[in-house]
C-alpha cells in the first residue's frame, strides 16, 4: 500500500519524537505471527495493503514489543508508589460527538467517557491497553488527554482537579479487521484537505460513469422551465411480492398494504384477484430466477418490484411510480456486466449471516441491487488506486450497510437510512438509496470528526485477545468493552464490510454465545477467562482494569465474574449505568444485570500473591486479603449530598470476595463465616455497617461530621430462600421496622413471594425464621448479634447438610430442592476435597441453576478441573 501524503508530511516530526520509523509490512514479518491465535482470513497481499507498520497491522502486530519499549516504563514493586481507588464519580457523556457517529460500526463507547477513566487511573506517558478496541475509542481518549477541547478540559479540571493532562500511549487490539482499520484511521494523522479533495474526485469520476443509473424523467406536474431535463433519484422503494394462498395470485405488498397518502402500513390486506383478507405470515414469497455472473450459476432470489421513486428536480423533491423508462433502465442495468472487482463470497457460517439464505441472499453481492453494486465497484477500484486508500476505505465502508438491501423503507420516517441495527434483517420493503448522496454527506462528517486527530502514538494489532504479543507486567491500565453473551455476533455482522477490504475475522476465537457455530455459555466463559488471564499477565501489579458490561442475563453476568476471578483479578466496585440520566449508581450483584455495568477490578501486588501461597491454610491469608481489598475501595463517595454506603465494605461481600479469591487461587479457605465476621469486628474499625483500615477511618469520620449517610433500602424480589432471608434481614433491621412477631411478618412475606424460582423448594416462613433469627420473650424475631450468631449458623448448616445428604443419596435429576442446602453442601464437600461429589450433584441440577448462581458455578467450575 502506498503511503499517504498526509502521513509522509508527519514523518519528519515523528522521527524527532520517537525512534519508531514507518516501514512496510513484509511476508517475513507475517510469517512470525501467522500461527498466533486470531490471525485473520485473507491473503498476505491484502493484509499488507491494509497495514501501516509498525503502528498498525491487519494481523497480529509483530512490533508491539518495540512500541512498549519505546514508550513504556518497567515495573519494580520496590520503587512503585502508585495508588488509586476505583473511579466512583458520575459519568455522563452523550453519543452525539462527530467521531462517535462517523462510522456505523456496531457498538462504541463515547471517547470522552473513557477519558475520565484514563485520567483517573493513569499518568501522562502510561501505556493503556484495550484488547476489544472496536473503533478505537480508547485510543482516541488516550491521545486526546494531551489536547482536549477547552470546554471538556474546564469540566474535568472542576470535577477532577487531581488529574494530570498529557498523552497516554494506547495499545489496541481487536479480532475484527474492519474494527482495527477504523481504529487506525481514528488514531492516526488525518489530512482533512487531502481527504476531502480525493473523496470528491472519486465521487465525480464514479458519477461520470454510473450517474445515468440514478436519473429519471420528471412527471408532468413537476416539469417546469428549468434547464434540467431529468431528475436525480434520491431513493427507489422495492417491495416484496407474495403469493395468495387461496388463488395463487401474485400480490405486490406495497400496492396491497401501504396507504400512499398517509404512509401507514396495514396489518391486513386483500388479494386483488380473489378478495381474501391476508396477513404477511399467511403468504409465501414469490421468487425470480436469474444468472449470477460473478458466481457463474443460476440462482433463485426473492421477487421484488420497484414501486416508488423519490427524486429531486429543479431544487424540489417529488415522488412517482416507476414509468416505462425507469423499468427500461433497470432492465439494461440487470443485463450489463460490471467491469470492476466486487466481493462475491459465500456468507460466513452463522445464524445471523445465513438468516437470508431462505430468500436467496446467500453471497455478499446479493445484498446489493445491481446499480448499487456497479457504483460501489467503480468507487472501490478508484480508492484502491489512490495513495490515500487507507482513509478512503473507512469512508467507503461507513455507508455500505445503509445503501444495501438492509435499508428498510419506513414511510413515516424521514431519515433516509434505516437498517435494523445488530442484525442483517431484510425488510419486505427496501429503500435503495442513492450512493452518491450517501457518500457526499459522509465527507464533511469524517472531516469534522477527524480534523483534530492526535497523531501516530498508538499501536494497533488484529488478532485474538487470548494471545497478545506483549510481555508481562508492562501495561499501566486496561479499559475494555468485550462482547457479552449473545448480544451481537460481530464477525457475522462485519462480514459485508470485511469482504470488501479482503480480510475477514477468524471467528473461532470470537468470545460470544452462538449456538449456530457450537458456542454455548461454557465456551464463551472459557474464551473470556483466557482473555482476562492474558490481561492479568500483561497488566502491572497494583493496577486497574475497567470492564463495561451490557447483558440482561444473570448467567452471562456470573460467567464474567467467574472469568475475572479465575484469571486472578479482584473486583472492587460495580456500578450501573442509569440510561435515563447517564449516571452511575452502585449496586449489588442481585440487581446488577438489569442495567449496563462498569466493573472496576485490580491486579494484586506480587508480594501479596506470594504471601497468600506461603501462608496457605493459615487464617492470616483471610485478613491479608481483607486489608489489601479495603485499601482498594473508595473511603468516601458522596452522591446527592449523602455518603454512599459501599457494599464492598460490608461484612457479607467481604466474606464472599475472600472465599472466592481463595478458591479460585487453590488456597484453602481458613475461616467460616462466623469466625470471619467476629474477626472483622476485632481487627478493623466499623462505621455505619462498613469496615475501614486505621488510616482510612479519620477521612470517613471527618466526612460523617458534615454529611449524612444515604438511607438505602434495596428493592428485593423474594424468589428463593436466599432472597427471603435478605428480605427478613431488611425487615428486622433496627433502622427499618425492627423486631417483629410471626403474625406481623407473615402477611407482608406472603405479599412479597409472588413467583418462586423454578426448581426452588421454598421453606415455610417459620422454618426460615428458626434457622436464621432469634426470638425474644415477647415472641418477636430479631437479628442475632455476633456473639450468638455462630451457634445459630452451625445449627442451620447442620439442618441444610442433612437435606443435602438426602439429595446425594437420591438418584436422577433433581427437580425440586433448597438452593441454600446445595450451597452449604458444595462448601462442605469443597473443604473435604470431594470434588467428584460436587461435579456429580452439579450435573444432576438444572443447567440454569448452576449458571445463574455465582457461588455454585465457582465450586462446580473449579471442581470440574480437579476430577
Model-inferred region functions:
Residues 478-479:
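Hydrophobic beta-strand segment of the Class I
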Residues 4-6:
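Cysteine-centered motifs
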Residues 525-541, 566:
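A short glycine-rich, Lys/Arg-flanked "PGG" loop and its adjoining helix->strand segment in the class I
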Residues 543-549:
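Conserved beta-strand signature within the Rossmann-like core of class I S-adenosyl-L-methionine
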Residues 15, 19-131, 139-474, 490-517, ...:
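Nucleic-acid modification enzymes, centered on SAM-dependent nucleic-acid methyltransferases
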Residues 135:
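Conserved SAM/SAH-binding loop
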Amino acid at each position: 500500500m502506498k503511503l499517504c501524503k498526509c502521513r509522509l508530511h508527519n514523518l519528519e516530526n515523528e522521527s524527532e519524537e520517537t525512534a519508531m520509523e514507518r516501514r512496510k509490512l513484509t511476508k517475513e514479518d507475517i510469517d512470525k505471527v501467522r500461527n498466533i491465535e486470531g490471525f485473520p482470513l485473507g491473503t498476505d497481499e491484502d493484509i499488507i495493503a491494509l497495514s501501516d507498520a509498525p503502528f498498525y497491522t491487519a494481523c497480529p502486530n509483530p512490533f508491539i514489543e518495540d512500541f512498549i519499549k519505546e514508550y513504556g516504563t518497567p515495573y519494580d514493586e520496590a520503587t512503585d508508589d502508585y495508588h488509586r481507588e476505583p473511579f466512583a464519580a458520575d459519568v455522563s457523556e452523550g453519543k452525539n460527538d462527530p467521531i462517535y457517529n462517523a462510522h456505523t460500526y456496531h457498538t462504541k463507547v463515547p471517547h470522552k467517557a473513557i477519558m475520565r477513566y484514563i485520567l483517573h487511573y493513569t499518568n501522562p506517558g502510561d501505556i493503556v491497553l484495550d484488547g476489544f478496541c472496536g473503533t478505537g475509542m480508547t485510543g482516541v481518549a488516550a491521545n486526546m488527554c494531551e489536547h482536549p477541547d477547552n470546554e471538556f478540559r474546564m469540566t474535568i479540571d472542576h470535577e477532577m482537579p487531581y488529574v494530570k493532562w498529557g498523552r497516554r500511549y494506547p495499545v489496541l487490539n481487536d479480532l475484527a479487521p474492519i474494527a482495527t482499520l477504523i481504529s487506525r484511521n481514528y488514531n492516526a494523522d488525518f489530512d482533512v484537505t487531502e481527504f476531502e479533495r480525493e473523496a470528491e474526485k472519486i465521487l465525480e469520476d464514479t458519477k461520470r460513469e454510473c450517474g445515468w443509473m440514478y436519473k429519471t424523467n420528471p412527471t408532468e406536474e413537476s416539469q417546469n422551465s428549468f434547464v434540467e431535463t431529468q431528475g436525480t433519484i434520491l431513493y427507489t422503494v422495492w417491495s416484496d411480492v407474495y403469493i395468495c394462498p387461496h388463488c395463487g395470485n401474485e400480490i405486490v405488498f406495497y400496492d396491497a398494504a401501504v396507504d400512499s397518502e398517509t404512509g401507514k402500513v396495514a396489518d391486513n390486506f386483500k388479494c386483488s384477484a380473489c378478495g381474501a383478507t391476508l396477513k404477511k405470515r399467511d403468504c409465501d414469497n414469490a421468487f425470480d430466477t436469474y444468472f449470477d455472473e460473478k458466481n457463474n450459476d443460476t440462482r433463485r432470489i426473492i421477487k421484488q418490484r420497484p414501486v416508488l421513486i423519490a427524486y429531486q428536480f429543479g431544487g424540489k423533491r417529488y415522488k412517482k411510480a416507476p414509468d416505462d423508462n425507469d423499468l427500461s433502465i433497470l432492465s439494461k442495468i440487470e443485463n450489463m456486466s460490471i467491469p470492476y472487482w466486487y466481493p462475491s463470497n459465500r456468507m460466513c457460517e452463522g445464524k445471523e449471516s445465513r438468516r437470508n439464505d431462505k430468500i436467496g441472499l446467500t453471497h455478499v453481492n446479493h445484498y446489493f441491487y445491481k446499480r448499487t453494486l456497479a457504483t460501489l465497484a467503480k468507487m472501490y477500484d478508484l480508492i484502491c488506486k489512490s495513495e490515500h486508500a487507507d482513509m478512503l476505505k473507512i469512508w467507503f465502508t461507513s455507508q455500505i450497510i445503509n445503501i444495501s438491501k438492509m435499508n428498510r423503507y419506513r414511510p413515516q420516517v424521514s431519515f433516509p437510512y434505516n437498517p435494523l441495527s445488530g442484525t442483517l434483517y431484510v425488510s419486505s420493503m427496501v429503500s435503495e438509496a442513492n450512493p452518491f448522496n450517501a457518500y457526499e454527506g459522509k465527507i464533511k462528517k469524517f472531516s469534522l470528526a477527524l480534523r483534530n486527530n492526535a497523531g501516530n502514538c498508538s499501536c494497533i494489532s488484529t488478532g485474538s485477545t487470548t494471545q497478545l504479543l506483549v510481555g508481562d507486567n508492562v501495561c499501566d491500565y486496561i479499559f475494555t468493552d468485550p462482547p457479552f453473551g449473545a448480544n451481537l455476533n460481530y464477525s457475522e455482522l462485519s462480514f459485508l464490510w470485511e469482504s470488501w477490504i479482503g480480510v475477514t475475522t477468524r471467528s473461532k476465537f470470537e468470545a460470544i454465545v452462538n449456538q449456530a457455530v457450537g458456542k454455548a455459555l461454557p465456551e464463551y466463559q472459557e474464551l473470556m477467562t483466557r482473555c482476562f488471564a492474558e490481561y492479568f499477565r500483561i497488566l502491572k501489579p497494583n493496577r486497574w482494569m475497567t470492564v463495561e458490561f451490557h447483558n440482561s442475563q444473570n448467567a452471562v453476568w456470573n460467567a464474567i465474574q467467574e472469568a475475572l476471578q479465575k484469571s486472578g483479578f479482584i473486583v472492587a466496585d460495580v456500578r450501573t449505568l442509569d440510561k435515563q440520566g447517564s449516571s452511575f449508581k452502585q449496586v449489588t450483584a442481585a440487581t446488577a444485570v438489569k442495567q449496563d455495568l462498569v466493573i472496576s477490578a485490580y491486579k494484586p501486588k506480587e508480594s501479596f500473591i506470594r504471601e497468600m501461597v506461603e501462608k496457605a491454610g493459615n487464617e492470616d491469608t483471610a485478613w491479608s486479603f481483607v486489608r489489601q481489598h479495603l485499601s482498594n475501595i473508595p473511603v468516601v463517595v458522596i452522591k446527592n449530598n449523602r455518603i454512599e454506603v459501599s457494599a464492598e465494605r460490608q461484612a457479607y461481600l467481604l466474606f464472599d470476595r475472600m472465599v472466592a479469591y481463595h478458591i479460585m487461587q487453590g488456597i484453602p479457605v481458613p475461616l467460616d463465616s462466623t469466625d470471619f465476621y467476629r474477626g472483622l469486628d476485632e481487627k478493623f474499625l466499623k462505621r455505619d455497617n462498613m469496615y475501614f483500615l486505621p488510616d482510612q477511618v479519620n477521612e470517613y469520620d471527618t466526612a460523617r461530621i458534615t454529611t449524612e449517610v444515604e438511607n438505602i433500602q434495596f428493592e428485593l424480589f423474594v424468589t428463593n430462600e436466599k432472597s427471603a432471608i435478605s428480605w427478613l434481614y431488611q425487615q428486622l433491621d433496627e433502622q427499618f421496622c425492627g423486631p417483629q412477631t410471626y403474625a406481623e411478618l407473615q402477611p407482608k412475606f406472603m405479599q412479597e413471594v409472588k413467583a418462586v424460582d423454578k426448581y426452588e423448594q421454598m421453606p415455610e416462613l417459620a422454618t426460615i425464621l428458626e434457622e436464621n433469627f432469634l426470638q425474644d420473650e415477647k415472641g418477636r424475631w430479631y437479628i442475632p448479634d455476633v456473639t450468638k450468631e455462630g451457634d445459630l449458623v452451625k445449627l442451620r448448616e447442620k439442618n441444610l447438610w442433612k437435606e443435602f445428604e438426602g439429595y446425594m443419596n437420591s438418584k436422577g435429576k433433581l427437580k425440586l430442592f433448597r438452593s441454600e442446602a446445595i450451597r452449604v453442601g458444595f462448601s462442605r464437600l469443597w473443604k473435604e476435597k470431594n470434588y467428584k461429589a460436587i461435579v456429580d450433584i452439579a450435573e444432576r441440577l438444572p443447567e440454569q441453576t448452576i449458571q445463574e448462581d455465582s457461588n455454585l458455578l465457582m465450586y462446580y467450575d473449579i471442581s470440574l478441573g480437579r476430577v
